[in-house]
Amino acid sequence: MFKIRKRSVPKETLKGILRKSPSKTSKVSQKVGFVDDHGKPIAEYRDFPADEGDEASSSDSHYEKKAPLVINRSGDYQINRMKWVVYSVKNVKKQNDEPSEMRIMEENRLTENNISRAPLFGTFDALDSPNLTTDAIIRARTPVPIITSGSSPDIPQCVSPVQNTYQQIFENNTDTSDEVQDFSIPPPPYPSSFPAPTTPLLALMSQLKQRGIISGEQNNQPLDNVNPMPQQFDRRPSRWTQGSWKVDRICTYYINRPDKCTRGDNCRFKHDDVEREHRQKEIQSSRNQSWHHRTSSHKYSSENSDHRGYRRHRSRSPHARQ
């Protein structure tokens, strides 16, 4: 009998991107990824052919026959000079070498306005004025000694600015100093009499009295040297804290709070003691009606009253303060 063996199909060898020495068992060329420093993208690979003596099983027979001779003749440092094979790889961003639309617009704007975006070294924009050029030529032709032969000119004296002193500001020319003022000297007395009013002033006052703007009765009181203007303090309006400005309402804080009103006599509202006593009695009676004795389901003896399980409550009972 003949024994039939099932023929197995060899699997395709995986292609790695790492650089390895060509294996004797592998007949497929390796693909090695690299980063070129000449601006080429990463999606470029180079084929390393298999050994020359082995049978070629790859479709890239051209490179397998031709490249090994170059590798054998050249040294290890010359392998990078071999020809590169570029493969098209999907989903790779295309390198854009053209300028963008905004870059083109900016370049056109600079060209139209004659503006140099990045001027070269050693160049500058000079103001070429004919007047300045003529003046420079005349000055260059005029000989000027380096060291002056004559005496140096006198420095012009600057006029000192006017300083504002106390004598210029005030009318009196008394010397001011930082000495302590002597208060032992009494001030000059206040004048007891004033000059009589003039005729035009009297005529004006009589007209105002006829129209009723000024009252006809005026008390001509003599002025006092100590208090020369007593009417100034009499006509001053009293403050709101005084009794004449109190509101005809009872102060709520005075009748409700146990400590009375905190403002005292300066309060704007009235402080009625009778109303306060009546209100305090109502508050105390409402407290007595709302208070209930605490009933507990557990009875504690006098011995265990101060131990665990006993809870002290703050009572509003009128007998608690006794």
Curated annotation (Swiss-Prot):
Keywords: Metal-binding, Zinc, Zinc-finger. GO terms for molecular function: zinc ion binding. A zinc finger (C3H1-type) spans 245-274. The keyword Metal-binding applies. Residues 1-63, 278-322 are annotated as: Disordered. Residues 309-322 have a biased composition (Basic residues). Residues 34-49 have a biased composition (Basic and acidic residues). InterPro entries: Znf-CCCH_4, Znf_CCCH. It comes from the Eukaryota. This is Uncharacterized protein C50C3.1. It comes from Caenorhabditis elegans.
